[in-house]
Amino acid sequence: MFGAMELNKAAKAAPKDVKPLIGCEVYIARESMHQPHSKKNGNGYNHLTLIARNNEGYKNLIQLASSAYTEGFHFRPRIDKELLSKYADGINCLSGCLAGEINQLFKLDKDAEAEQLASDFRDMFGEDHFWLELQRNGIELQDKVNENMVRLAKRTGIPLVATNDIHYLRHEDCQAQD
């Protein structure tokens, strides 16, 4: 979100028609964003990717990001599903990387819970505004999760989207990420 204005200016200045996608990866608290997480339940949050599809969605992303920092910050800026539901209008949602909740449920062989959560997200964002992510990153667990995502898409009709978990632009920047 912090680079949205610069991205928009660069897209307008581009020689070809470039449509910027403004979005962010958010941390979703497993319980309330107002409760600190404890070591006994892991890190206490999951990842989710949100992309504004219109001006209302952009304003809602700003609200979610601001609330994550001002109300939900505990080691990381977090929101919860209650707040996400309140500000879901105008936003497209992707299921997230391996740290996404659906993927974590698949990792624990909780397929029925993963399917229910995917249906809940589809209901929250609207039928045409939630996608299940597939990634190919050389991680063996990712391949297992991808197989589960494909089966889930066939059962639920939720569409698939191919993405990747990008953390740096150039290979030489990898040291800063690591």
Where are the regions that the model predicts?
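Phosphodiester-processing cores and adjacent nucleic acid-binding clamps
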Residues: M1-D178
